[in-house]
């Protein structure tokens, strides 16, 4: 690995430990020429997930889009950044475990909604209102009734 300071190609690993719940390895390196220490992360390169949108368009799965939607839905709610990140990780892991390289955007939205329903009902309703694009208030009220019915079953 090339030193970011002097560009010398020889470095040695000083320390190595798991990071990101074991999904990557954090390494402290030291340049053999100038002695500069820096950190690198090693992660398995995964094949891209392709999201098939409702109009048939295809784009690469973007964790950041899922995270932004969750942050917006959870604004001013008692949901931590760690909980949001855990949902993003779980959704991506579940999508990859399907084993298909192309995933319908509907499936992503449904998985996120299911996670939110178990975490925070207000955030769930916020996310659902944007994701499902309710045409009028009656559809929105129906969704609330369904949520209340599910709560009775718990």
UniProtKB/Swiss-Prot annotation:
Negatively regulates transcription of bacterial ribonucleotide reductase nrd genes and operons by binding to NrdR-boxes. The keyword Repressor applies. Binds 1 zinc ion. GO terms for biological process: negative regulation of DNA-templated transcription. It comes from Listeria monocytogenes serovar 1/2a (strain ATCC BAA-679 / EGD-e). Its cofactor is Zn(2+). Pfam families: ATP-cone, Zn_ribbon_NrdR. Belongs to the NrdR family. GO terms for molecular function: ATP binding; double-stranded DNA binding; zinc ion binding. Residues 49-139 form the ATP-cone domain. A zinc finger (unnamed) spans 3-34. It comes from the Bacteria. InterPro entries: ATP-cone_dom, NrdR-like_N, RNR_NrdR-like. Keywords: ATP-binding, DNA-binding, Metal-binding, Nucleotide-binding, Repressor, Transcription, Transcription regulation, Zinc, Zinc-finger. This is Transcriptional repressor NrdR.
């Amino acid at each position: 690995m090339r030193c970011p300071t002097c560009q010398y190609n020889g470095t040695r690993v000083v320390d190595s430990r798991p990071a990101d719940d074991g999904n990557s390895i954090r390494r402290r390196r030291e340049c053999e020429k100038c002695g500069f220490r820096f950190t690198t992360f090693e992660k398995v390169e995964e094949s891209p997930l392709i999201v098939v949108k409702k109009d048939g368009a295809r784009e690469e799965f973007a964790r950041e889009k899922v995270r932004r939607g969750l942050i917006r839905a959870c604004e001013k709610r008692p949901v931590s950044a760690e909980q949001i990140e855990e949902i993003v990780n779980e959704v991506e892991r579940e999508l990859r475990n399907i084993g298909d390289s192309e995933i319908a955007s509907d499936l992503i939205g449904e998985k996120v909604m299911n996670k939110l329903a178990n975490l925070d009902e207000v955030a769930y309703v916020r996310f659902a209102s944007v994701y499902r694009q309710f045409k009028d208030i009656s559809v929105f009220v129906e969704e609330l009734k369904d949520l209340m019915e599910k709560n009775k079953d718990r």
